[in-house]
Structure formats: C-alpha cells, structure tokens
Amino acid sequence: MDNQENDQKSPYPIGKTALLVVDPLNDLISEGGMAWPMAGTVIQDVKTVEHIHDLLKITREKGIKVAYAPHHRYREGSYAERKYLSPTQVAQLGPGHMLSQGKWGGDFAETLAPKAGEFIASEHSCSSGFAGTNLHAHLTENEITHLIVVGMITNSCIEATVRSAIDLD
C-alpha cells in the first residue's frame, strides 16, 4: 500500500489533526533525568524516545500540526498556594527540584524539542495538558478535531490529557 492510499484511508484528517507531545522534558524522559531511575528501563525497552522522534518526523513531513503540552517547571514559590500536591509536585519541591526552570532537567529533550512555529501550550501544573492552560483555545482556534497524543507519563499526564480532551467541546 503506498502512502497516498494510506492517507486516503486515514481516520485522521490532516488539516484537522495535531500530534500533541506531552512532557518531553529531560527530567522525565532522558537518561540522567531525575525520573530516569524509575522510568529509564521501560523508556529504553519500549524505545519511547525513538518512537516519539519517528512520529514527530512523519507528522512534520505530512504537514500535520504539532503541539506541545509541557509540565510546569519549578520556580521559587511554586505550589505555595496549593493545598494538595501530586507526586510530581512533591518531587519538584524536594531535593534537586525536578523539572527546574532554566536547568537541563526542565528543558525539552533535544531530539523531541519543538521546531520553530510549533505551538507550545502554557505549562500544566498537575496532570492534564488542558487544565489551566491555553491548549484547548489553541486547538479550537486552529480547528483541530483529532489528536494523536504521545509523551510522558502514560498513567498520569497522558491519561489525564486524553480524558480531558474527550470532555471538551
């Protein structure tokens, strides 16, 4: 089957589909990141970085829009007003301040970083890439009706982002 035939059979209309990359930040997805001791084996075994990189390459070649939903980067005073904290927020407040603004751990992983012109949503502070961000407004403004969602961490930010997306108009 050639690519043109694949495009015609795709349930994802190119002009209305976006690849949403959630939390491709060094502390979460890169060797040497603070979450690597917990997630590194799985990331390597299932080739997470390689698969996301390949998907980015293909979607960019096809002209599919790419958007990013980054997690909040720690700054002095982060979460001072929150009554309840998620495990990631606790890790950000702990020693080393995971996902620190302006440090390697809070930067996008080099091979998964946004290209010029790709949308980077405002930072989400807990799990969903939609909660408290401008992501929904951007997707709506660009008439995006279909999402392909990849990134970190499946049972937290990916799941919450997908569940939120389904609930939106």
Where are these regions (language model features)?
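Short, hinge-like loop/turn segments at secondary-structure boundaries
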Residues: 83-87, 139, 166-167
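Glycine-rich phosphate-binding loop at the start of an alpha helix
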Residues: 133, 155, 159
